[in-house]
């Protein structure tokens, strides 16, 4: 669908692409991946070990998509893309290579108590079959509670990129009505911030979709970076949050997803939550 869209036809892109491509294996290509439990590494399926090549594969995957998103966005239009913190740099490089200007990085902070996913060395020491029990206890005491380097996750990164403007901020707005923010939009009653605190939604409500985002957060972003009546695009629609939020914000929207089940969920949500 992206290939068929007109140049300079979209005002805003808000999207949450899949992070763990090789963890989704061939099922992702068939449109059946993504409904698995989460493991110790946020955003990646259980049993999948993160390695540096993961980011390179994500960047390779996003490069042609970002090229199309750059093409279809109006000059001055923004692209807001969610990412796992350890992958956001690859996502950013891909957007920059496509021609975008990187404006900022935001944090979606969630207050719900997340699982502390660090592993204690005690367990691994106890599994050492060639060690005497006394030696194990001595080593456990020596390690003094050391764990693997995973802190309790409390945020997701949001990359903010912008297609270069035509002329000045004012001239670009007068021609395309893009490139500026509506600073009246606020989550807290204060000026909009780079840290946005919104509670996580219930995954079970959306057929167990792993990375569903809060409608309130997406609606805030849409209102901040676009105007009523404009077109918002999400090329990784998932359970439909972007389209629901866009309709609530009185914007038009285009949602794309390879998973037919999620398309049906999105259609139902749009009908149930916006009428």
Regions found by a protein language model. Give the residues of each.
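Core catalytic lobe of class I
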Residues: 1-275
